[in-house]
């Protein structure tokens, strides 16, 4: 027997559907069902079925509405009055939903529209997500529009504009509609190109120069076709409108005519194929694991990895840090390095602390040096000029020590007044502070501070002051102060603090780097020193300048060539990814450890697979094998777990979860070392000697066991954890950025000609009180939490401070001192409510 659907199509009769409908009527009255009810339901279904078969034998077509009439009459006949009322209401509700669906679907010829609308009604059954509201707004927008593509865009716009604090899930509904629109357009494009499989798509993209040839070189057709079976299109439902919109606009592969040819899930799979490419054992299993954590939004990779993995130019690393030497060729080499890094989408940190100050001698000529500002302006102009094919200008943070003679002028680089010839508005200044500075500020604000030229110290004393830290640095600093041969620029420390705070309030910068904290905790202090951090202040790794060894003229193939030989120094590279805490079951230690294990493995593979814009980066990366695993969704997970930001419970959570993440990351790196070998300078490191564990007070039996295993097997990665800001990728994951509190629970952003609502993730009556905005949060709670996290993070964190217009300069200063007291290694922006700040996309892992 066949049943006639409402659209006139026949479908096979299924008794189970009748049982489901009757069961729903009974459950609406009594839930759970009484023991005797299932038998009653079976008998009622049999009675309905008997009437249907009689009708069918008589040659009368059986329509779906007739079945519902029979159910209603049968319930009435056997005196199930409450159930009848429920069933009538159910039918009425279904009718209303069907009418709302059809009001929208009739505007489109593709039948998949109706299917998506049905799915939306099933997944969002609450009244505030009724399709009646969507239909009303859509039809109001549509009016005389007949073009189906334009109509679909208006339907999406209607869903987006229905998003509100009281109905935040309209953003998920809008994403479903956006995915439908994208899929329909993509299907048409693929049909024209005669592409019917993932393998055919990769082949076409490769031949078009849009996909790396290395994928098909490393994988057989059978392996790529197996990988295609891993695709889980249902995971597209995890996207919000904002996240899907960003992926489709920025990250899926498009033709040179800007036609998209890749789905979000294929993007994740392509990245997984790239990152697993060099695996020699269980390679396809690693492809699946990488794809799983990416597609389930449990891990986000850095923006360059998301953009460039699987493509011909596969620069996968986020940020680079260079030590600028005190020589003409060295300075220009650093500027050239920055231009190459920027060309391929990386951000840069430049340490200028070795460059001589204004008035220093050059080749014995007194007063000849022009100081660091003219070189910083060169970096500024390079950032503007090398703009990544017009996509965005380069970004560079410039670091200087607080005792450098040029620091007062440096602190005015971006302020609004003063000589514009001394400004560099397109760089991000940052200051490196020793402990002595903050001790003096805290204990004796009336004291003097002595500024000196690093070149002069090197000439007179025979050592570079910046090459020391903590007590040894302090001893040598006072030795230099007392040495009459070294000229000093004396400034009241109060005046220097005033210049810092004035710039911070006006521009949000300079960033702060607490160099003594960073170097005390450096697990590779036996091989060098950390002068500064990177563009987003989360990286803390050994640094040293590139040095020219020789220049020789020789002959190759009968022609004269000039050969330069350089020592590569320690040119820092940041390979970043983030755990999305809100998308991981943190109560399940096995799940957390598995996700961390997969993320660490993927990051370790990035080191061998990335394209290096400069060779010095490749040497350093291969030697230290440094990675930076961080987190996003921090405020989101606090809200999910019912934890107030301003509470001791938050502090306990921060300490506990980061210890677990750290242990899992160390275990993962140690496991890879056992398989592939330890990083180049493991021997003698804090990892090797056990000092890493002792410094952090890791004394439990589990930690002692892990310490012994690390000593035996080594560590694959010299640096492990670093918390990036994740400003872009947190949007993709539908969560909060980094470890910062949210800016607002809800706000409107104008984009593409419409108002885009931005809603705090998982916003509900329960989470609403827990989403206190960043500027309303007592900042000391944020700093205390950061201090507790820092114990478990071998590198640093991108932590912003948020101030209101009510803050005094003294209150801002107190926050800086407090951050130093709790052991933080860096501070990123100070974000005032009256200040617009450009967010960095480079470390958006």
Swiss-Prot record:
Domain of life: Bacteria
Gene (UniProt): nrdA
Coiled coil: none
Family the UniProt entry places it in: Belongs to the ribonucleoside diphosphate reductase large chain family.
UniProt protein name: Ribonucleoside-diphosphate reductase subunit alpha
EC number: 1.17.4.1
Any GO BP: deoxyribonucleotide biosynthetic process
Catalysed transformations (reactions): a 2'-deoxyribonucleoside 5'-diphosphate + [thioredoxin]-disulfide + H2O = a ribonucleoside 5'-diphosphate + [thioredoxin]-dithiol
Record organism: Treponema pallidum (strain Nichols)
